[in-house]
C-alpha cells in the first residue's frame, strides 16, 4: 500500500455513511461519526468482510461503537467472492483498498498513529496478511476468527488482537488461531488472544473487548 494520511484536508465531512464512489460495483463504505472533532486527527479502522460478504458486513463489525468512540470506519468490498490474498496472490483487492484509502485521506483528517485494520473470517486472514505487510501504516490489527496468514514481506510491528470460538466448525480453532497465535508470539509480535465458547461468530463481548483494546477515542 502506498496511501498515507497527510495534512488536514479541509472541513470535516458531514456525519453519516457514504459510498466513496470510486468503484463501479462493490464500492467502499465510509462511516463518519457525528462526534468527529473538527481540526483534530481522527482514528481510522479499515474493516474487511468474510467470504461471500460485502462492505456492509465489514462495517457492521464495529459500527455500533463508532459514535461512542469517535471512530471513522471504512469497509471495502472484495472484487470477487473473497479477498485475493486468501487465494494466494495480493492484487486487485490491494489496489482497490489503496484507492479507497487515498480518497479517505483526502476527505478526513486521519491520525497517522491511529490506523487499524480488522476483519472477520477470510477478512481476518486478509487483515493479518495486509496488516503485517504494512506495519508502517497500520498500528493495530484485529482478527476475528482468522484461518491463516497470507504470506507477504512484513514491515513494522503492529499490535494484534485475535479472537476465536472454541466450537468453530468453519475454521476450527485447533487448525487456525491455536497455531497462528503462538507463531506470532515467537516472532515477537504483541498479541492479545481471546478464546470464547461458541462458533464462527463475533460475540458482543468480544467486540467490546476489541474496542477497549484499541483504546482510541
Features from the language model and the residues they span:
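Short, proline-enriched alpha-helix->beta-strand connector loops that line the catalytic pocket
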Residues: 155-160, 187-189
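Serine-hydrolase catalytic machinery in alpha/beta-hydrolase-like enzymes
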Residues: 13-29, 34, 39-109
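A domain-start/cap signature at the N-terminus of enzymes
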Residues: 1-44, 89-92, 122, 130, ...
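Conserved alpha/beta-hydrolase "acid-adjacent" motif
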Residues: 169-176
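Primarily recognizes the serine-hydrolase "nucleophile elbow" in alpha/beta-hydrolase
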Residues: 58, 105, 113-157
